C-alpha cells in the first residue's frame, strides 16, 4: 500500500466576469484564481495490486456540514482516475476540512485537484487526460490541479498561468457562519448584461492591482440578494487599515481583503473577529 499526505489550498477569485452562456446552460467566465495557505489536508492511500476498485472510499472530517461520502468531488475524481490506473486497485481518501464548504473558496474543487495531481503523477497519466478528468469533475478543478495563480477562461478549461504576481500576498478571509450558497443557484440568477471579454496580456501582470480595480465579481450583487450580510462583510474589510482590495470570492458567501502588510492583515483579522463573533475570519497568505 502507498500513502500520501497532501494539501488542498483554498481558491480565491480575485475577479469573476460572466461573459456568455452556452446552449448547454453553462456560463462562460473570465477570472483570476489564486490560492492560499489555508488548506484542507488529504491522506490518500492506494491499495495493493488487484484490490477491488469498487471498495474505494472517502471520509470527511471537521466539515461544518455533512458531505455525502459517495457523491462528492473527491469520489468522482477517484472513480474517473481509476479508469486510467495501470493496475486494478482501490483508493481510500481521508479529508480534513479547514476550508468552509459552499462558500466560494473552492473547498471541494481543491480536494479533487489534489487527488488528480497526486494519482495522476503516481500512475503517470498523460496531462491532457488529467485536464479532461479535472474538467469532468468540476469547472474549478483544472485550475486547482496546480494551485498556482492563473487567468481562467471558458467554463474553466482555458488556463493562462501568471508569470509575475505583482500583488501583496497578505489576505484576510471572512464568511458569515452557517451561511452557504449554491453555485448553480447563484449562476442561474444571472440575467443581466454579459461582461466584455478581457484582452489578457503581460502588461496586466505588471500592475495587477490597477488591473483588478477595473474588474469586479459579476455574481456579487446576486449573492447579496440571497445573503445581504455579504455587503456588510465587504464594507468591514474595506474599512480596515491597510486594505487595498476587498470583494466577494466566487459565488459567495466568503469575501477577501488584500492588505498592504502582514501586520495590517493580522490586526484586521483580530479586529473583525472581536467585533463580529458570528463571522468566520482567517488571516492567511497567498501562494505565489
From Swiss-Prot:
What is this enzyme's class at the first EC digit? transferase
Q: What is annotated as the active site?
A: 11, 140
Question: Could you say which protein family the record assigns here?
Answer: Belongs to the GHMP kinase family. IspE subfamily.
Signal sequence extent? none
MF terms per GO, please?
4-(cytidine 5'-diphospho)-2-C-methyl-D-erythritol kinase activity; ATP binding
Pathway per its UniProt entry is: Isoprenoid biosynthesis; isopentenyl diphosphate biosynthesis via DXP pathway; isopentenyl diphosphate from 1-deoxy-D-xylulose 5-phosphate: step 3/6
What PANTHER family does this protein map onto?
A: 4-DIPHOSPHOCYTIDYL-2-C-METHYL-D-ERYTHRITOL KINASE, CHLOROPLASTIC
- Known EC number(s)? 2.7.1.148
Organism of provenance: Wolbachia pipientis wMel
Q: Binding positions for ATP?
A: 100-110
Function statement: Catalyzes the phosphorylation of the position 2 hydroxy group of 4-diphosphocytidyl-2C-methyl-D-erythritol.
Q: Does the keyword Cell division apply?
A: no
- What processes in GO biological process is this protein linked to? isopentenyl diphosphate biosynthetic process, methylerythritol 4-phosphate pathway; terpenoid biosynthetic process
Q: What is this protein called?
A: 4-diphosphocytidyl-2-C-methyl-D-erythritol kinase
Q: Which UniProt keywords are listed?
A: ATP-binding, Isoprene biosynthesis, Kinase, Nucleotide-binding, Transferase
Catalysed reaction equations from the record: 4-CDP-2-C-methyl-D-erythritol + ATP = 4-CDP-2-C-methyl-D-erythritol 2-phosphate + ADP + H(+)
Amino acid at each position: 500500500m502507498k500513502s500520501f499526505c497532501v494539501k488542498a489550498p483554498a481558491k480565491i477569485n480575485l475577479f469573476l466576469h460572466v461573459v456568455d452562456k452556452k446552449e448547454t446552460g453553462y456560463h462562460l467566465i473570465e477570472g483570476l484564481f489564486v490560492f492560499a495557505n489555508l488548506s484542507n489536508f488529504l491522506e490518500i492511500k492506494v491499495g495493493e495490486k488487484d484490490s477491488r476498485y469498487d471498495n474505494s472510499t472517502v471520509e470527511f472530517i471537521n466539515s461544518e456540514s455533512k458531505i455525502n461520502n459517495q457523491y462528492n468531488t473527491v469520489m468522482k475524481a477517484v472513480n474517473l482516475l481509476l479508469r486510467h490506473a495501470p493496475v486494478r486497485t482501490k483508493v481510500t481518501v481521508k479529508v480534513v476540512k479547514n476550508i468552509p464548504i459552499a462558500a466560494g473558496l473552492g473547498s471541494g474543487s481543491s480536494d479533487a485537484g489534489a487527488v488528480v495531481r497526486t494519482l495522476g503523477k503516481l500512475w503517470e497519466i498523460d496531462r491532457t487526460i488529467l485536464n479532461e478528468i479535472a474538467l469532468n469533475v468540476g469547472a474549478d478543478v483544472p485550475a486547482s490541479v496546480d494551485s498556482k495563480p492563473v487567468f481562467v477562461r471558458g467554463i474553466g478549461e482555458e488556463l493562462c498561468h501568471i508569470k509575475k504576481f505583482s500583488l501583496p500576498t497578505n489576505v484576510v478571509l471572512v464568511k458569515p457562519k452557517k451561511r452557504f450558497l449554491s453555485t448553480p443557484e447563484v449562476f442561474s440568477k444571472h440575467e443581466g448584461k454579459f461582461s466584455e471579454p478581457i484582452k489578457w496580456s503581460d502588461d496586466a501582470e505588471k500592475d495587477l492591482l490597477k488591473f483588478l480595480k477595473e474588474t469586479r465579481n459579476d455574481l456579487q450583487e446576486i449573492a447579496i440578494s440571497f445573503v445581504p450580510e455579504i455587503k456588510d462583510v465587504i464594507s468591514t474589510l474595506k474599512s480596515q487599515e491597510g486594505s487595498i482590495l476587498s470583494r466577494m470570492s466566487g459565488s459567495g458567501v466568503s469575501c477577501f481583503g488584500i492588505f498592504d502588510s502582514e501586520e495590517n492583515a493580522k490586526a484586521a483579522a483580530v479586529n473583525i473577529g472581536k467585533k463580529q463573533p458570528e463571522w468566520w475570519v482567517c488571516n492567511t497568505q497567498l501562494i505565489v
